[in-house]
Amino acid sequence: MAYNWWVIRVLCNKSLEEVIFWRLDSFGCRGTASQIQGKNCLVLAYLPEEQTQLLDLSALSLNFRQDALCMNFPVPIMDWYLIEEEDWASSWKQYWQPQEIGDHFLIHPAWLDLPEQSDKIILRLDPGAAFGTGTHPTTQLCLESLEMRLGLEPHPEAIIADIGCGSGILSIGAALLGVHQIYAVDIDPLAIRSTINNGKLNQIKAEKLIVEQGDIKKLIKLCPKPVDGIVCNILAEVIIDIIPHLTAIAKPKTWGIISGILLEQAKLIGDTLEQNGWVVATLWKKEEWCCFNIRYS
């Protein structure tokens, strides 16, 4: 039996992209993509027809409006329409092309042929319904920070933790940069599946990338000893709650890469980090977003 799918399109300011993704994920959407259009961003998402009603879609549009007004951005434009099942899984993929990030990474959609020659570290990705294609400034900042932190030399004993792994892009990036062991968690089961599948796409061994569904408390139980590094690219409101727990997996000189944070939220995050024993080494910025590079003292 064929099913129909809602296509939800949201045209918004680029700085709202992560909030839009979060709303769509919470709404139950499967498969998301985004395309930068000047100062704006076109976000697409898909939802089974039977899973929602028109009134629910209208309420979602109102949530987008309220988010934008609270953050002093223009109100997003949202519309929706139905397509048949065989079209939904691939229709969003036309909006996503290979993208270079930093000095060494090439994020490459899994359904496209690999380049015949490349001097880049090719990270193959099929995000499915999980957040993290490499197009968002916070993901780019995190990958660039990983490059800076790890370089291109192997790290045969290094262990890192990934909080809110999404598509697995940061965990896999770390593995491709030579990290020995990665522990990753996400509360979304679709993200867990996506991270595992993308690990296989990039020939990362399952024992190297340990992925479990859960929150920071699950991660603390998962890590057998303090880690060398922590990556976390999620909403600032969640980061605030997580920071006091980070010491449970940290040791002196553990480094961290923390993003998902608007510039206007940076002071609160920075103050909270310092109150919990972390030193802010650098603060990187891209558009309206920032990334903390930190160290545990």
UniProtKB/Swiss-Prot annotation:
Predominant place of localization: cytoplasm
Superkingdom of origin: Bacteria
Enzyme class: transferase
A Pfam cross-reference name: PrmA
InterPro entries: Ribosomal_L11_MeTrfase_PrmA, Ribosomal_PrmA_MeTrfase, SAM-dependent_MTases_sf
Listed GO biological process terms: methylation
GO cellular component: cytoplasm
NCBIfam families: prmA (TIGR00406)
Protein name: Ribosomal protein L11 methyltransferase
Functional note: Methylates ribosomal protein L11.
HAMAP family attached to this UniProt entry: Methyltr_PrmA
UniProt keyword Chaperone, yes or no: no
Family matches, as CDD domains: AdoMet_MTases (cd02440)
Known catalytic reactions: L-lysyl-[protein] + 3 S-adenosyl-L-methionine = N(6),N(6),N(6)-trimethyl-L-lysyl-[protein] + 3 S-adenosyl-L-homocysteine + 3 H(+)
Subcellular location per the Swiss-Prot or TrEMBL entry: Cytoplasm
EC number of this enzyme: 2.1.1.-
GO molecular function terms attached to this record: protein-lysine N-methyltransferase activity
Keyword terms: Cytoplasm, Methyltransferase, S-adenosyl-L-methionine, Transferase
Encoding gene per record: prmA
Residues given in the record as S-adenosyl-L-methionine binding sites: 139, 164, 186, 233
Family under the similarity heading: Belongs to the methyltransferase superfamily. PrmA family.
